[in-house]
Amino acid sequence: MTKTAKVNDIVRDWVVLDAKDKVFGRLITEIAVLLRGKHRPFYTPNVDCGDFVVVINANKVKFSGMKLEDKEYFTHSGYFGSTKSKTLQEMLEKAPEKLYHLAVRGMLPKTKLGKAMIKKLKVYRDDKHPHTAQTSKKDAK
């Protein structure tokens, strides 16, 4: 019989990922897999069985091609003429946390379960983070 995961049986780990000199898309894919729990043998789609993920050195990630200048992110408040855009370079300098959340959110389910998963993602610009107590028992990847 196939064993399904129960909410009470899940033990969540804290995984620290260093984004320095890693390709952004591949890093985001790895984060999404860890948040969903697809790396576990008892993965169940309707249960949040993923780990907590801490990303350090978020603004030192690499992009291929001319994405830093060409890729744009748009926001709209709902009023006429209020469309604003920022390039990837501006987003990376001003708010790398938001950039990671936007990219990972696109790979997670668009449900309440997806919102619970994205709350387990912690992104920090440099190598200092307040989660050393949770992650001290393991080495950083």
UniProtKB/Swiss-Prot annotation:
GO aspect biological process, one term: negative regulation of translation
Cellular component terms (Gene Ontology): cytosolic large ribosomal subunit; ribosome
Pfam families associated with the record: Ribosomal_L13
Listed GO MF terms: mRNA binding; structural constituent of ribosome
Keyword Magnesium recorded: no
Keywords: Ribonucleoprotein, Ribosomal protein
Signal peptide residues on this chain, from the entry's feature table: none
Described purpose of this protein according to its UniProt entry: This protein is one of the early assembly proteins of the 50S ribosomal subunit, although it is not seen to bind rRNA by itself. It is important during the early stages of 50S assembly.
HAMAP family for the chain: Ribosomal_uL13 (MF_01366)
Family to which this protein belongs: Belongs to the universal ribosomal protein uL13 family.
SUBUNIT field: Part of the 50S ribosomal subunit.
Protein name, entry field: Large ribosomal subunit protein uL13
The gene coding this protein: rplM
